[in-house]
Amino acid sequence: MLAKYTPAAAWFFAPRKTDDLGRWASTIREVTQRRTSIWVQVGTVAEALAVTQACKPDVLVVQGTDAGGHGRERGASIVALVPEVADAIAALSLPPEETPALVAAGGIADGRGVAAALVLGAEAVVMGTRFLACPEAAIAAGYRAEVVRASDGGAATARTKVYDQLRGTTDWPEGYNGRGVLNRSWEDAANGVPFEENKRLYEAAMELGDAGWGPQGRMTTYAGTAVGLVKGVMAAREIVDEVREGARQVLGRGGEKL
């Protein structure tokens, strides 16, 4: 399948054993004659070093804890994580062909975030939460509306395992959880409501369709701390164009305040 339909990239995340990455990467490179880039998402400096030595990735996606959805329970924002990973990789003194490109993830939703990531040492960025608010995203309308509604993302979201427990998606490796917008399910768990009752209410909310989302709803809205920067729904191409131009403007006037 890989030989016939060769993907541009294979993106790995949260392996149970880091050593598995070496075997997977080797197989993909052999089958695709190295036409498929190997991307690995990491959340700590130690993980970045272990992954680099295990499979020589083409790209390290350095995910800070501001990211929505799943990631490391313990870590740092990209402000500290990206430069420390960059320094640690540089200290390995790898030849250029074995030095991974760094791509920043987590808390980036506009040109300012992109500009910051590039200055910190990333070569590119990936955005998740911002693209939830585009018509191309295959999510429920209620989910999308909640992403647009939410603000003050640092206070309105939390890293937790509650949503996985309610959804039955508890097979993540140790040390991972997910960041989502706070709702009644999270509040009830924090206030000591028995899990069985919280689960019953969650399952009832599933029958409400789009009305199941929202601050008084119970459906999960995975999103990062930059959710407050998402102001409306835009086409994916328009988001890319706007963010790219915003980054150019910020970088262009970066020296004015020095």
Residue ranges and their predicted role:
Residues 17, 108-109:
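Gly/Ser/Thr-rich loops at beta-strand to alpha-helix junctions
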Residues 41, 105-106:
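Short His-Asn-centered micro-motif
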Residues 72-103, 109-258:
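Conserved active-site-proximal phosphate/metal-binding subdomains
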